[in-house]
Amino acid sequence: RPDRPSLIDASSGRSLSVEESARLTRGLAWYFHSLGIGAEDRIVVCVPNSIWHFIIHAAASWIHAVTVPLSPLLPDKQRQEIYELVSPALIISADGHPVDGVSALPLSLIEERALQAVNQSPATWEPLTCYEQTAALVFTSGTSGKIRAAQLSHANLWWASQCFRDG
């Protein structure tokens, strides 16, 4: 059911259908691929919560890249430390803040890039199969107060989504 609602942005009220979400995901995956981003490359997502977190993650998963979600409220020094730890291939942020030697993309251009790229992707281009590969690095300080990355596989995220969905 391609017209069924897929994602709803709570802050803006924007709703995407299954078809729209799939089209944006495919286009963004091809855009990342065209930048030379591939398996195990890191894509930092440092933007306020929105539907784009999901679309960016799904697009990165398509090519086996790893998303690294970061709060835009983190102090600059802490963000810089994380950038040094993960060596991102791309940083997506609200303002497109550049980091030495790393491509930056402002969130405001994501949809435009995805829609341009979707028409360039081959019709036969399909997501790569993945399961145990790293899907995301989630930074936490835990009880120690020292920032650490929790490495989550696609299987971890699938299990978590099923638990959330099924209660």
Briefly describe each language-model feature range.
Residues 93-131, 141-146:
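ANL superfamily adenylate-forming
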Residues 21, 61, 69, 82, ...:
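Structured catalytic cores of enzymes that bind and process phosphorylated ligands/cofactors
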Residues 57, 68, 72-100, 115-119, ...:
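Conserved ATP-dependent adenylate/AMP-binding module captured primarily in the ANL superfamily
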Residues 2, 120-139, 146, 151, ...:
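Conserved pre-ATP/AMP-binding loop-to-beta segment of ANL
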Residues 43, 60, 134, 140-143:
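Conserved S/T- and glycine-rich ATP-binding loop of Class I adenylate-forming
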Residues 6-50, 54, 58, 75-80, ...:
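Conserved AMP-binding/adenylate-forming core of the ANL superfamily
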Residues 64:
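Structured binding elements
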